[in-house]
């Protein structure tokens, strides 16, 4: 990478206050799927640095430190993010790939973790609803609040039947915009961080939903350090960041939010 590009990334990352001074000419929605959580803390720090709220989609995924992302050991992390005003949706409990639609509203599902790992199973509509709701049960135990009525299928692959079943359970599916695919799961040998950053800064448009992970197994050179210059650069372009609670397509989907902390204020 050239010195000039290094300098640009460093300049963007170091200028949160100047970015905040820019007028808001558009809105983007930054979202994160759990992944292996290797960069969860650093990403949370970047969001605090820039005073940006994001939306997190939670699955109980195996982490880089050997536990699972919704184990009690992560309770403090989720509680802190909830207190900071971020939004949260379901990414299914076992991070399962959704297969072709089955009969009678059933969903074919291949869990990545836990029971039936690596096997395609058929979940009844009731069981699929339970799979969607289970991350919320852990989240509520740790934070005192509910998940927002949103979900994202692992890989973004949701069939018409799964979408319909989830909707009956009260969940709206959230896909990302084409320009919002930040590419953090692509091979770094062919998709450098600098190229992915430049592509996002060039192509993201008003209303786009952006997607990355809190850690990913499939990339050697992690993209997480680019979140800092990405946020700064988009602010320099005049974008404001909002959670999906403020997205016009999902606003009506939200149930009442219960925060244990709010009762003590």
Regions found by a protein language model. Name each.
Residues 22, 54, 64, 219-265:
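C-terminal domain-boundary segment and adjacent tail
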Residues 14-17:
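N-terminal signal peptide c-region/cleavage motif recognized by signal peptidases
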Residues 1-8:
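Bacterial N-terminal signal peptides that target proteins for export
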Residues 21-116, 120-123, 131-149, 249:
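Active-site beta->alpha N-cap acidic-glycine motif
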Residues 70-74, 192-196, 223-227:
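Charged helix-capping and loop-helix junction motifs
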Residues 157-203, 238-250:
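His/Asp/Glu-enriched short active-site or ligand-binding loop at hydrolase and phosphoryl-transfer sites
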Residues 56, 88-90, 175, 212, ...:
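Hydrophobic residues in well-ordered beta-strands that form the structural core
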């Amino acid at each position: 990478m050239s010195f000039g590009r290094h300098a640009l990334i460093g300049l963007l990352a170091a200028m949160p206050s100047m970015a905040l001074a820019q007028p808001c000419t558009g809105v983007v929605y930054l979202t994160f799927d759990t992944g292996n959580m290797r960069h969860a803390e650093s990403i949370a720090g970047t969001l605090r640095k820039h005073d940006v709220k994001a939306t997190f989609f939670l699955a109980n995924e195996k982490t880089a430190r050997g536990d699972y992302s919704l184990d009690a050991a992560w309770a403090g992390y989720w509680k802190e993010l909830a207190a900071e005003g971020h939004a949260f949706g379901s990414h299914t409990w076992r991070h399962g790939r959704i297969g072709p639609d089955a009969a009678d509203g059933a969903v074919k599902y291949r869990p990545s973790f836990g029971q039936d790992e690596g096997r395609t199973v058929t979940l009844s509509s009731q069981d699929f609803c339970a799979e969607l709701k289970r991350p919320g049960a852990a989240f509520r135990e740790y934070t005192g609040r509910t998940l927002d009525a949103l979900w994202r299928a692992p890989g973004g692959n949701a069939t018409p039947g799964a979408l319909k079943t989830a909707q009956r359970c009260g969940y709206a599916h959230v896909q990302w915009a084409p320009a919002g695919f930040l590419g953090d799961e692509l091979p770094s040998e062919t998709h450098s961080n600098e190229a992915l950053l430049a592509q996002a800064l060039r192509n993201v448009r008003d209303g786009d939903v952006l997607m990355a992970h809190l850690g990913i197994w499939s990339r050697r050179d992690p993209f997480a350090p680019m979140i800092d210059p990405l946020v700064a650069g988009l602010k320099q372009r005049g974008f404001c960041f909002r959670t999906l609670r403020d997205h016009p397509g999902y606003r009506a989907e939200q149930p009442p939010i219960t925060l244990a902390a709010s009762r003590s204020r």
